[in-house]
């Protein structure tokens, strides 16, 4: 039976609204008191604000992160716009610049506070683009990448320079559907058709390279079968499972934080 195009659009619109509604109840994580302690920005994948990044934000809070936690919607609201979010490179650079401006404004208003940017899937690409655009005098604390849809040979040096604690790349070779076949066919955020760094990790320069010291700020964490005990089966969305976030990501953010080092 042939599906009418209008039906597809309606179903897509309803699905998009359901995803968006899941992320609308985080106001208690964005209070002025929390913003005074620091800021964690969660960047969704190409699906936009959703159940998965809501779980990620809640898992951080439940795991003891006391900073403000916000979901930053960088994607288009057009129904069925996921491919636009993946493929519109110049638009994505513009959205990354807007995120950079948002971060700089926060740091001006809250000097010395920590800012951590956590990007899932396509949001990982936006996180890196925004970090590399930051002014040298406004570094952020860290970038945490979960199943990042960036090419493995992407040059991380500009982003690494603008992070105090570095970039943490969480990847899984079991993420073959989205970040193996998917990005090989549809492309990565940086528009290369290849398995993504969220599946195979980022390339590192050789030990003789002058960039070796800078790349020491890149930490790569491969999915481990032990993570199954916390709801993460190695799949694309497993990084957002609340139990995994509480056990692995919340302690990392807390460890990287500097709550007593305000200027």
Label each region the model flagged.
Residues 13-17:
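Hydrophobic membrane-insertion alpha-helices, especially the h-region
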Residues 46-197:
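Serine-dependent carboxylesterase/thioesterase catalytic core
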Residues 178-263:
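C-terminal catalytic-base region of ester-bond hydrolases, centering on the histidine
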């Amino acid at each position: 039976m042939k599906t009418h195009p209008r039906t597809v659009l309606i179903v897509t619109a309803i699905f998009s609204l359901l995803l968006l509604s899941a992320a609308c109840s985080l106001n208690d994580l964005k209070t002025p008191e929390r913003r005074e302690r620091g800021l964690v920005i969660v960047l969704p994948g190409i699906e936009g604000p959703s159940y998965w990044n809501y779980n990620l934000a809640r898992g951080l809070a439940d795991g003891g992160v006391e900073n403000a936690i916000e979901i930053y919607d960088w994607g288009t609201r057009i129904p069925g716009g996921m491919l636009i979010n993946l493929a519109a490179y110049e638009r994505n650079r513009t959205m990354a610049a807007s995120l950079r401006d948002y971060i700089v404004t926060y740091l001006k208003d809250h000097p010395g506070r920590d800012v951590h940017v956590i990007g899932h899937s396509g949001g990982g690409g936006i996180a890196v683009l925004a970090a590399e655009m930051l002014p040298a005098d406004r570094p952020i604390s860290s970038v945490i990448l979960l199943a990042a849809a960036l090419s493995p040979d992407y040059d991380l040096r500009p982003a690494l320079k603008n992070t105090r604690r570095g970039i943490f790349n969480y990847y899984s070779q079991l993420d073959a559907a989205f970040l193996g076949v998917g990005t090989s066919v549809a492309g990565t955020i940086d528009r290369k058709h290849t398995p993504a760094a969220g599946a195979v990790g980022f390339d590192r320069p050789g030990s003789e390279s002058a960039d070796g010291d800078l790349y020491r700020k890149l930490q790569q964490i491969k999915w481990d079968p032990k993570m199954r005990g916390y709801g993460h089966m190695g799949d694309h969305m497993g990084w957002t499972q609340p139990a995994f976030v509480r056990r692995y990501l919340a302690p990392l953010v807390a460890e990287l934080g500097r709550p007593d080092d305000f200027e």
